[in-house]
Amino acid sequence: MKIRASIRKICEKCRLIRRRRRIMVICSNPRHKQRQG
C-alpha cells in the first residue's frame, strides 16, 4: 500500500474507489494499491 498526496491509475486494471472519505486504488496487481494520505 502506497500512501500518496496524489494518486493515479498505473495500469488498465486499476480502479479508483472511495472508502470512508478516502480515495483508493485497487488493482489485481498488489503493488498498485494506493491510498490518498
UniProtKB/Swiss-Prot annotation:
Principal subcellular localisation of the protein: plastid
Top-level taxon of origin: Eukaryota
SUPFAM superfamilies: Ribosomal protein L36
Keyword annotations from UniProtKB, A to Z: Chloroplast, Plastid, Ribonucleoprotein, Ribosomal protein
GO molecular function, one term: structural constituent of ribosome
GO biological process, one term: translation
UniProt keyword Nucleotide-binding, yes or no: no
UniProt GO cellular component terms: chloroplast; ribonucleoprotein complex; ribosome
Cleavable signal peptide: none
Annotated localization: Plastid, Chloroplast
Pfam families in the record: Ribosomal_L36
Signal is among the record's keywords: no
Xref: InterPro entries: Ribosomal_bL36 (IPR000473), Ribosomal_bL36_sp (IPR035977)
UniProt cross-references to HAMAP family, sorted A to Z: Ribosomal_bL36
Entry similarity comment: Belongs to the bacterial ribosomal protein bL36 family.
Protein name as it appears in the record: Large ribosomal subunit protein bL36c
Gene name tied to this protein: rpl36
